[in-house]
């Protein structure tokens, strides 16, 4: 195996793994960053409807309650996210009663600096489709396309690459067409003693060429651009019979006189 072939195979495997990983993620929500989200406040405000749906706080009681409940929501909890490179980011997630908002605080400013985020950029959150406790975070620049179409495009491209990889040098349509056409021809002419041979390591016929084979008064015209095995003769009534397999339809013309001779021979 050549070095280039090895690297190409490894690259295809790596891209396939990435495509599978992306397909296993479920988009939760995204937010366009405000100046305060990337400013000196060092916090990201999570829209309330998304926060309560996807990141519910334990012992959360926003409508009043004991001092312990309020202290719990203010303290919050740690949320862990994986970025596009697989790196883990941990943020302090809590509810601020003063502003009645859900926020990511500790760890957020480091993420902003690492990704060089500015106001107008977008952050989006995802979750694993099967492991619901596994969360992901990503970002894109202002004006770039949404993440959902990107996932769709990757999935379609992966499908095309997979088809091209398994098909190799064989055209899938021709492979199926030949396999479905072959049994009918074999059954039709098997009683004449025709021999069917598997086509392995057989030179192809030049495209555009045709060949006519006469079989008991039947002219079989086989068009080119097909792979056909070498003829195998069989003997029926001291006559040599040749069989040619082809995935293309055959033009059959009957010679009445020859058929009558065959009938007389059988009688």
Curated annotation (Swiss-Prot):
GO CC entries: nucleus
SUPFAM superfamilies noted in UniProt: DNA-binding pseudobarrel domain (SSF101936)
DNA-binding segment(s): 29-143
Domain of life: Eukaryota
Gene3D superfamilies: DNA-binding pseudobarrel domain (2.40.330.10)
GO-annotated biological processes: glucosinolate metabolic process; regulation of seed growth
UniProt keyword list: DNA-binding, Nucleus, Transcription, Transcription regulation
Family annotation (InterPro entries): B3_DNA-bd, DNA-bd_pseudobarrel_sf, LEC2-like
Principal localisation: nucleus
GO molecular function: DNA-binding transcription factor activity; sequence-specific DNA binding; transcription cis-regulatory region binding
Subcellular location: Nucleus
UniProt key word Nucleus: yes
Name of protein: B3 domain-containing protein At3g11580
Organism: Arabidopsis thaliana (Mouse-ear cress)
Chain's gene name: ARF32
């Amino acid at each position: 195996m050549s070095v280039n072939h090895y690297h190409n195979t490894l690259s295809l495997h790596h891209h396939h793994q990435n495509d599978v990983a992306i397909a296993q993620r479920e988009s939760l929500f995204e937010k366009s960053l405000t100046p305060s989200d990337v400013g000196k406040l060092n916090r990201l405000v999570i829209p309330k409807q998304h926060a309560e749906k996807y990141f519910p706080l334990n012992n959360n009681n926003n409508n009043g309650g004991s001092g312990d409940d309020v202290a719990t929501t203010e303290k919050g909890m740690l949320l862990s996210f994986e970025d596009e490179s697989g790196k883990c980011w941990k943020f302090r997630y809590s509810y601020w009663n003063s502003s009645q908002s859900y926020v990511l605080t500790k760890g957020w400013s480091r993420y902003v600096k690492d990704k060089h985020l500015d106001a107008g950029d977008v952050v989006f959150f995802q979750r694993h489709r099967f492991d619901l406790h596994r969360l992901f975070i990503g970002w894109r620049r202002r004006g770039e396309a949404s993440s959902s179409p990107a996932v769709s495009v990757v999935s379609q491209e992966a499908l095309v690459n997979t088809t091209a990889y398994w098909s190799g040098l064989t055209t899938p349509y021709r492979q199926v067409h030949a396999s479905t056409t072959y049994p009918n021809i074999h059954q039709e002419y098997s009683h004449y003693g025709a021999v069917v041979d598997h086509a392995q390591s057989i030179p192809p016929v030049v495209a555009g060429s045709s060949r006519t084979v006469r079989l008991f008064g039947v002219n079989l015209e086989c068009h080119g651009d097909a792979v056909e095995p070498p003829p195998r003769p069989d003997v029926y009534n001291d006559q040599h019979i040749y069989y040619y397999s082809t995935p293309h339809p055959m033009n059959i013309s009957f010679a009445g006189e020859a058929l009558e001779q065959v009938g007389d021979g059988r009688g």
